């Protein structure tokens, strides 16, 4: 997929939330929270425009392309339950999301880079796909090279992780264990998923 490489702060401001977590993007959002560009009197977006913005939030936050998002949508559409909630829960199970949320990295792009460079193993096997779907019982660990371990120890020391209810994390051994699948309370992105479902169903 074509990964967004432009100004992160611009996306945060346009969509009105902190989707990219770099220090520069955070400072820019604090200074100028309004959308980029010339500002006239604000107009309420149409239902289509509002749903499009919610879809864009999911794509940028989790690092998904359009086709990948639609594949996820088709997958959860075959299951029983709230489709919007199931879509977000599938995104939460991505390896790059969990690597970020347990505290191995400060941002999801950093997590994706580490995974594609082969820094992590799942159940003892090197995984290089950021979108790898984790299951209950999976063990994530940094590969045995000491320079890699020191790299991630430094990140953790500077930004202690908050912790997740569904994933245990040992900062000493650099291991994370998926205790269970995430639930609705574990979704980290505030978004109107139902409007996204309606948008993707068109």
UniProtKB/Swiss-Prot annotation:
GO biological process: ribosomal small subunit biogenesis; translation
Gene3D superfamilies: Ribosomal Protein S4 Delta 41, Chain A, domain 1 (1.10.1050.10), RNA-binding S4 domain (3.10.290.10)
Cited InterPro entries: Ribosomal_uS4 (IPR022801), Ribosomal_uS4_bac-type (IPR005709), Ribosomal_uS4_N (IPR001912), S4_RNA-bd (IPR002942), S4_RNA-bd_sf (IPR036986)
Domain S4 RNA-binding, chain residue ranges per copy: 93-155
One cellular component (GO) term of this entry: small ribosomal subunit
GO MF term set: rRNA binding; structural constituent of ribosome
Alphabetical UniProt keywords: Ribonucleoprotein, Ribosomal protein, RNA-binding, rRNA-binding
Pfam families: Ribosomal_S4, S4
Cited function: One of the primary rRNA binding proteins, it binds directly to 16S rRNA where it nucleates assembly of the body of the 30S subunit.
Complex and partners: Part of the 30S ribosomal subunit. Contacts protein S5. The interaction surface between S4 and S5 is involved in control of translational fidelity.
Similarity-based family: Belongs to the universal ribosomal protein uS4 family.
Protein name according to UniProt: Small ribosomal subunit protein uS4
Originating organism: Rhodopirellula baltica (strain DSM 10527 / NCIMB 13988 / SH1)
């Amino acid at each position: 997929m074509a990964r967004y490489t432009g100004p992160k702060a611009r996306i945060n401001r346009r969509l009105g939330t902190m989707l990219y977590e770099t220090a520069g993007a955070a400072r820019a959002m604090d200074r100028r929270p309004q959308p980029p560009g010339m500002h006239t009197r604000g107009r309420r977006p149409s239902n289509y425009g509002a749903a499009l913005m919610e879809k864009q939030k999911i794509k940028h936050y989790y690092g998904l392309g359009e086709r990948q998002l639609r594949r996820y949508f088709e997958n959860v559409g075959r299951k029983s339950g709230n489709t919007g909630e199931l879509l977000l829960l599938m995104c939460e199970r991505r390896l790059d999301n969990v690597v970020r949320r347990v505290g191995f990295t400060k941002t999801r792009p950093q997590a994706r880079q580490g995974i594609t460079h082969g820094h992590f193993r799942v159940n003892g096997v090197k995984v290089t796909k950021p979108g790898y779907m984790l299951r209950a019982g999976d063990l994530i660990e940094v590969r045995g090279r000491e320079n890699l371990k020191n790299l991630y120890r430094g990140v953790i020391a500077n930004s202690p992780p908050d912790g997740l209810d569904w994933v245990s994390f040992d900062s000493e051994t650099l291991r994370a264990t998926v205790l269970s699948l995430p639930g609705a309370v574990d979704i980290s992105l505030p978004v109107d998923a139902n409007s996204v479902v309606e948008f993707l169903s068109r």
